[in-house]
């Protein structure tokens, strides 16, 4: 294991040195705080989403009987952004989304952020009063939602309500009608790296849900860091003589089986796929039997959810009726996976198990482990994701603990 760790560190140093893809530099952010950032780095998430144009007509979003390419997705997003601008939405304004997973969630998400507004994904499991609280707390001017969420908001004034086309209702303007005839190209807006991009709500340990602001810099840094550790791990496996498919493999795809209002859904499954050109197969809600069918039909290579979901796949009565050999990773987060489950997953799927630890406040990044490292140490949460992440473990008096304590 020590040789493997030494090789990991060696490759990390190679990939982050001057002139390489993940070269870093030390600077001060807009508030004067010292930070480390990637040298090769989009100025904002609008520039990050433009990377999707490089994937062109390649399939990006699959939802039920619909299929959208990267270009079609970004065209829809641009139309939504332009419609918001015509409605008076300006840089820094908050626009909420509250609905089950569907492509219009992603169109809206990209469009909101690309015009410099702040995207506020709300928990679609909330009741009306909880949604109203978050709308008021975030000072949202617009909400895009489905009928179940919008029907409880009739008394909310000064809030434009747009209904997803997947649950049409004559009392609300539909997403398709709202974006119709608007340009598919967005004009450039001055957006700085440290400008706010999103507000996600966490359950909070006490009291009401807490709104977590994230910047363009923070979100892009997470995506680049995940790409960095993926390339390090792939290169390490290759040098050790093992086969490993890189994250940039053009045939990779991921099953989006968790809500987009959670960073596991939006960041791990959706946003990361923009960078690497990965196909995203969307589920409106979790169903293990349906997931098995989709994995087989769409040749899904990656699944990331809570550990319970992969456990349900393993124990589903239809598992052996379908070809699931396309799976390369069965990752989890949001809680620990029982140690005894790790080997069972590894023994019963061709894909390798993995686990990660992160927070809404960190854009889901923190630690990560997969493959042999995980199987041999199934109680671990993994290594710190390089090269930007730092983790300290403190005691109750805020003193940093020594290693092993």
Go through each PLM region and give its residues.
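Conserved AMP-binding A3 loop
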Residues: 69-71, 197-225, 231-235
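Gly/Ser/Thr-rich phosphate-binding loop
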Residues: 204, 275, 297-305, 314-376, ...
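AMP-dependent adenylate-forming
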Residues: 22-30, 46-69
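ANL superfamily adenylate-forming
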Residues: 65, 148-193, 208, 220
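Conserved AMP-binding/adenylate-forming core of the ANL superfamily
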Residues: 37-40, 57-102, 106-110, 127-132
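A short helix-loop-beta submotif of the ANL/AMP-binding
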Residues: 81, 94, 100-120, 124-128, ...
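Conserved AMP-binding/adenylation subdomain of ANL enzymes
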Residues: 220-256, 261-301, 316
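Conserved pre-ATP/AMP-binding loop-to-beta segment of ANL
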Residues: 183-201, 208, 244-253
């Amino acid at each position: 294991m020590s040789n493997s760790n030494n090789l990991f560190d060696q490759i990390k140093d190679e990939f982050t040195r001057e002139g390489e893809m993940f070269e870093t530099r030390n600077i001060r952010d807009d508030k004067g705080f010292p930070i480390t950032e990637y040298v090769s780095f989009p100025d904002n998430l609008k520039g990050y989403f433009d990377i999707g144009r490089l994937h062109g007509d390649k399939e990006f979003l699959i939802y039920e009987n619909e299929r959208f390419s990267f270009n079609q997705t970004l065209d829809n997003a641009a139309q939504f952004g332009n419609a918001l601008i015509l409605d008076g939405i300006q840089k820094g304004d908050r626009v909420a989304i509250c609905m089950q997973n569907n492509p219009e969630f992603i169109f809206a998400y990209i469009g909101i952020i690309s015009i410099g507004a702040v995207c506020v994904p709300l928990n679609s499991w909330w009741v009306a009063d909880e949604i109203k609280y978050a709308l008021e707390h975030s000072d949202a001017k617009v909400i895009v939602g489905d009928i179940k969420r919008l029907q409880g908001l009739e008394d909310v004034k000064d809030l434009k309500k747009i209904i997803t086309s997947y649950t049409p209702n004559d009392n609300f303007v539909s997403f398709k009608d709202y974006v119709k005839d608007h340009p598919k190209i967005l004009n450039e807006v001055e957006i700085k790296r440290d400008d706010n991009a999103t507000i996600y709500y966490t359950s909070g340990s006490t009291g009401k849900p807490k709104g977590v602001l994230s910047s363009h810099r923070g979100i892009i840094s997470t995506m680049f860091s995940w790409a960095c550790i993926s390339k390090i791990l792939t290169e390490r496996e290759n040098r050790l003589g093992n086969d490993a498919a890189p994250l940039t493999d053009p045939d990779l795809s991921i099953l989006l089986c968790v809500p987009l209002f959670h960073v596991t859904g939006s960041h791990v499954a959706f946003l990361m796929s923009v960078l690497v050109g990965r196909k995203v197969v969307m589920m409106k809600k979790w169903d293990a039997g349906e997931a098995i069918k989709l994995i087989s039909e769409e040749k899904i290579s990656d699944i990331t959810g809570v550990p319970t979901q992969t456990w349900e796949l393993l124990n589903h009565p239809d598992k052996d009726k379908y070809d699931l050999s396309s799976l390369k990773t069965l990752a989890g987060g949001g809680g620990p996976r029982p140690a005894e489950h790790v080997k069972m997953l590894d023994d019963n799927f061709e894909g390798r198990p993995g686990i990660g630890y992160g927070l809404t406040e960190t854009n889901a990044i923190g630690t990560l482990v997969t493959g042999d490292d995980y199987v041999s140490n199934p109680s671990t949460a993994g290594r710190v994701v390089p090269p930007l992440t730092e983790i300290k473990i403190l005691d109750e008096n805020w003193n940093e603990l020594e290693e092993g304590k």
